Regions:
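Conserved catalytic core of nucleic-acid polymerases
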Residues: 110-133
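Extended, low-hydrophobicity segments enriched in charged/polar residues
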Residues: 1-118
Length: 220
């Protein structure tokens, strides 16, 4: 049951979900929305987690009025709280290994290893949250982007695979135009009308190694 007495009860349970407004404008209706670059951010408080899913309270203008807070306060608090959901970065190979060995995701988290990957073995990486829900929002955090840059050893592309995760690919050796076509093809093949709400975007992002710049990649 979603119960709370005040904003203070929600403050440390906030998290962010991101969408592409060109893809999912209908899912933004009636919500509090902040636009950053190509993404639209909506806000929720996760009051409980179960095997059936999350108990999310979505922030609407009516809820904001009832709580007596403004969007600047909500956004600031949500950016802080969002990191409480444990950012996870891993390779596909490591993920398969955990499935066979029944290991938790945190055991393969590259953020915990403090290593830089070798240029000759740089794979595609996945960025998500510990519960693998609404994990694409992790790319909004400059501190996370900088850690990724340190791990891959350079600038990188962000493939917006779904609202639950994004894929990370080193810039060297790839072209943004090819990656955009890849994302569009994957979206059209993997998503049906039933799960189309999980689509994030086909707009590949480029990020500087230091995490300072995140923008739409230029199609060479």
């Amino acid at each position: 049951m979603l119960s709370f007495n005040s904003y203070e009860d929600l403050k440390n349970k906030l998290q962010i979900r991101i969408y592409d407004p060109d893809f999912s404008r209908n899912l933004l209706e009636g919500k509090i929305v902040t636009y950053i670059g190509d993404f639209a951010l909506i806000y929720m408080a996760t009051l409980y987690e179960s095997e059936k899913g999350l108990g999310n309270l979505m922030f609407t203008p009516e809820l904001m009025d009832a709580l007596g807070i403004d969007i600047q306060t909500l956004h600031k608090d949500a950016m802080i709280s969002d990191l409480n959901y444990e950012p996870i970065l891993f390779t596909t190979e490591d993920l398969i290994g955990t499935l066979f060995r029944n290991k938790p995701l945190f055991s393969i988290n590259l953020f915990n290893r403090k290593v830089r990957m070798r240029d000759d073995v740089l794979p595609m990486l996945t960025l998500t949250k510990g519960n693998q829900m609404n994990g694409a929002s992790m790319i909004l955090h400059k501190s996370i982007r900088k850690k990724i840059g340190d791990i891959v050893g350079g600038n990188f592309y962000v493939l917006p695979s779904s609202i639950h995760e994004v894929m990370i690919i080193p810039e060297e050796g790839f072209e943004a135009g090819e990656l955009s076509k890849l994302v569009s093809t994957c979206n059209s093949q993997l998503y049906t009308e039933a799960n189309s709400k999980d689509i994030l975007s086909d707009k590949v992002q480029w990020c500087s190694m230091d995490g300072e710049i995140l923008r739409r990649a230029e199609n060479e």
